Amino acid sequence: MPKKDNNIEFVALDSLEYEVFEFGKYLRSVRQAKGISIRQLAKDVNKTPTYLSDIENGHNKPPEKELLETIIQKLNLDDSPKVKATLFDLAAKERNDIPADVKDYIMSNQTLLRIIRTAKDRPNSEQIWSQIAKTI
């Protein structure tokens, strides 16, 4: 249950399920959960409130890596790796790209690329990836 403080509604960041979110809506939820106004965040990242509002409302694409990292820093998400990863994942999904926080690693790792290409054509590859994730 969200709590209120000075008429601002907060939700626990861990309770945000990103599967039901678009990037902008998720960003807005995180920003509001942190109690930061759109004007303050815009000032902190050197953008206009209108620009950020357009992102939150789905009128602009998610920001590129550098700006997204700045937003994450200004939202003080260092203690929320799941939320950070979700922001990168949703931004990448809407851009039809690889998440920016892992792109360089994936592209520089030939073994990983070979494994991904092999797995994508295999039946039950989701189960294989789940087992790999458990091992790691």
Residue map of PLM features:
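A short, Lys/Arg-rich alpha-helix, primarily the initiator
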Residues: 4-33, 125
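Short, charged recognition helix plus adjacent turn
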Residues: 81-117
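Helix-turn-helix DNA-binding elements, focusing on the entry/boundary residues of the two helices
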Residues: 27, 38, 49, 64, ...
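The alpha-helix within a helix-turn-helix
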Residues: 31, 42, 72
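Short alpha-helical DNA-recognition segment
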Residues: 35-54
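DNA major-groove recognition helix of helix-turn-helix/homeodomain DNA-binding modules
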Residues: 65-86
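C-terminal regulatory/oligomerization modules of transcriptional regulators
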Residues: 107-136
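Short, conserved catalytic or interaction motifs in soluble domains
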Residues: 57
